[in-house]
Amino acid sequence: MINPTKVDVQIKEFSKEQLIDISKDIHKQGVAVFYNQKLNETEYTSVMKKFGECETPNLFMNPKEHPEIFLVTGKKVDGKKIGMFGDTELGWHSNGNSRHLIDKILIALYCVKEDINTTLSVCN
């Protein structure tokens, strides 16, 4: 079982060099959890770009202003899904379906609104 250390820091204040060091630790440990981050979409993508290049496939679940973000939600606007996956349990996962094309990958999740049903499981 992975038991990440709970550290109360704001990653948006880290330099690129500090984030690269963190990514090396993530590679060894398998996961890092940063609680209580106060990031808007621009700050989130700025931090992620310090780690490396972000994927921007421009699909329906990628906001036009921030195509690096993938919305994982069952929420609908005007009757249309705005994010990937279903209306109930989302069951979101990344199984590295394109890992054979790349030599490094980092997945970052940011929970905007947590509730009693919010669960994060990490398997490596």
What are the roles of these predicted feature ranges?
Residues M1-N124:
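Non-heme Fe(II) oxygenase catalytic core, chiefly the N-lobe of the double-stranded beta-helix
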